[in-house]
Amino acid sequence: MGYNQQLLRVDYEKIYPINDELSSKILGVIKNLNGKSDILVISDYAKGLITKELMDDIKKEFKGKILIDPKPKNDFYKDVYLIKPNLKEASQILGREIENKDDELEKSGLESVDKYNSNFVITRGEKGATLITVDEIFTMFQQKSKRS
């Protein structure tokens, strides 16, 4: 500590896939959501909870729309309703840098839609977010707050 401020932090963690028992419990909860919820949102932190096998089972069992906030190193989100990466994650998903320009984002977004058979919302920092579907591209701009 220096002048009551943290100067350095070191974390250690072990990341490993979940076991079959926990996977079954998660699927049981998701099955119970059918008829109660039309949308399932999954935020993946790449800590081992969401495995390819679990994701495949979730897609089979859940009858509503699945929305994913992904980690690019996990490449098993095909055929969900919507994937919401930020610009950096979208670049990692495609394996190349995507510039934060409308035409570049539209081209890359359509490529992502085709590759994953899913809609995409790519968040773009101060440039808002862009929704890309098979049929349309829509950019939403962030409203700047006014100070009184």
From Swiss-Prot:
Pfam families: PfkB. This is Uncharacterized protein MJ1336. Gene3D superfamilies: 3.40.1190.20.
